[in-house]
Each structure stands twice: as structure tokens, then as C-alpha cells.
Amino acid sequence: MSRDVVILACAVSAGVHAALAPQHATFVPAALALIVLAVGLARSPAPVLVEGAIVVLGGLIAAYALAATTGIPLVHPDREPVTGLALATKAIEALGLLAALELKGATRWLTSTATARSLSR
């Protein structure tokens, strides 16, 4: 199920980035990377693809956070307006990122007994 969530998140994000590419040429590499990841993960749960999804989805979320708050020098110097489409896309990417981290086993600390005890104090 987690792999399906990552595939869906990559595919949806790829579609959004591709649709916006005429206004934002810098979205083309993101759309291509997301398409490669979605297709690759649909064919195989290879660890390198899961790690790629973590890097790309996390990077897109971080890049948007910077673009919306301060701008990104040389690439996108002006602040990006916050829109509903952007927030929805980032929410989908965040779900995909969490699912990819789960596939990688990086969320095990959340369910450990020691972690649960320390968080409940």
C-alpha cells in the first residue's frame, strides 16, 4: 500500500508540474524526475527508486517552502504566491514522502515502545 501511495503522489505531482511548465520552465526537470520515479516504482520497488522519491519529494517541498517565503536566488528570485493548487500538491507530496520513508523503514522509531514512552511524558 505504501508503494502505491508513493506512485500516486509522484504521478499527481508530475501532472501538476507538467501542466504548469509553460509558465515555469524550471518545473520540467521535476516533472520528468517524478514520471521516471512513478513508472519505475510501478515496475519495481527497488531501494534506489524509493530513495529517489524521498529526495525528489522532500526537495520539492523544501524548494516550495523557500520559494513561497524568500524566493530562490538565480532560479526563482521572486516570492511564489501561495495558492490552493500549490498547497494541495505539497500535501500530496508530503503523503508520498511519508509513504516512501515508511517503505525505507525510516519511520520505525515512531512506533517503538521507547519512543512512545518518551513522547508520553
Sequence positions of predicted segments:
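Membrane-interface extramembranous regions
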Residues: 1-121
